[in-house]
């Protein structure tokens, strides 16, 4: 019985926190986030240019992932677009100006730059 109660509590807390997180990013900050997308409470989405973040449907942004839309040195803001059905792994960093195509996986600890030469 205790295992059942613990499991129910985990499921309820997870679903409620995910929905509140999405409400916060969509309504309060005005980010474009598709249906079915899950954003971990430990993920960090840049709020200096919130309209510049677009995340497609059915994507997952995991704990510790960082999505940045501004360049502190040059004081520029550039949008970030993450497509449908994408996965951004633990502690991955997505820098300003990046477009991630549909069905992409960004591995844990990755640094994604707009231009790789």
Where are each of the predicted segments found?
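Terminal amphipathic alpha-helical/low-complexity segments used for targeting or macromolecular assembly
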Residues: 1-30, 36, 103
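Short glycine/threonine/proline-enriched tight-turn/helix- or strand-capping micro-motif at secondary-structure
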Residues: 18-22, 42, 47-48
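Short, composition-biased local secondary-structure segments
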Residues: 23-25, 68-71
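Left-handed beta-helix
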Residues: 35, 40-41, 46, 56-57, ...
């Amino acid at each position: 019985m205790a295992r059942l109660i613990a499991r129910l509590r985990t499921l309820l807390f997870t679903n409620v926190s995910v929905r509140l997180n999405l409400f916060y990013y969509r309504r309060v900050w005005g980010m474009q986030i598709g249906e079915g997308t899950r954003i971990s409470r430990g993920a960090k989405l840049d709020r200096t240019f919130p309209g510049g973040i677009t995340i497609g449907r059915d994507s997952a942004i995991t704990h510790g992932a960082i999505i940045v839309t501004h360049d502190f040195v040059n004081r520029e803001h550039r949008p970030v677009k993450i497509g449908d059905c994408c996965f951004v792994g633990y502690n991955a960093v997505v820098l300003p100006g990046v477009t991630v195509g549909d069905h992409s996986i960004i591995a844990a600890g990755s640094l994604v730059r707009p231009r790789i030469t």
